[in-house]
Amino acid sequence: MISLVVARDRNGAIGRDGDIPWHIPEDLKFFQRETVGGAVIMGRRTWESLPDVARPLKNRLNLVVSSGRPEGAEHVLPSVEAALEVARDAGHARISGIGGAGIYRALLPLSHRLLITEVDLAVEDADTWFPSFDEAEWTVTTRFDLRAQGSRCELVEWMRKL
C-alpha cells in the first residue's frame, strides 16, 4: 500500500524556506508510528531538511529521489517509479511518500491512502503546498484530534475509492 503522509495548514501549505513551519510533537510521534518498519520515499530537500541525528530515519528503508548524490543517503534513485521498485524488491508492502511537494505530486496518482494532519493555522510566506486532489475519488475513513491545545491538529485518513 502506498500512503502519502503529510501535515498541511488550512491553505494546504507544507513548507516555508525549506522547512516545516511548525513543530507539533504529537504529529511527529504519529509520523514515526506510521512509517517505522516500512519504506519512505522523499526528495533531496526533504532528506537534507532532516536533522543530522535523524538521518537516515531509523528502522525504515530511506529512499531519496534525486538527480544528484545527497550526502549520507544510501539509496538514491532517479524517479519515484525506481524508488517504488526498490521498496517492493526489498519486500516492503507499506510504502510512504513523505515529501516534498514534487514527491507528493508524483505519488498521488499511485497512492491508496492519504494521511493528512490538518494544522489549524495559516502560514505566512509559505512557498510549498500539498497538491490538490479530487475528494470525489477518496473516502474519509478516520478522523481524530491529534492535539487540542495550541494549534489544533486533526488527522484525516483518506482511502482511494475502488
Language model features: what each stretch is:
Residues M1-L162:
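Enzymes that bind and transform nitrogen-containing heteroaromatic metabolites
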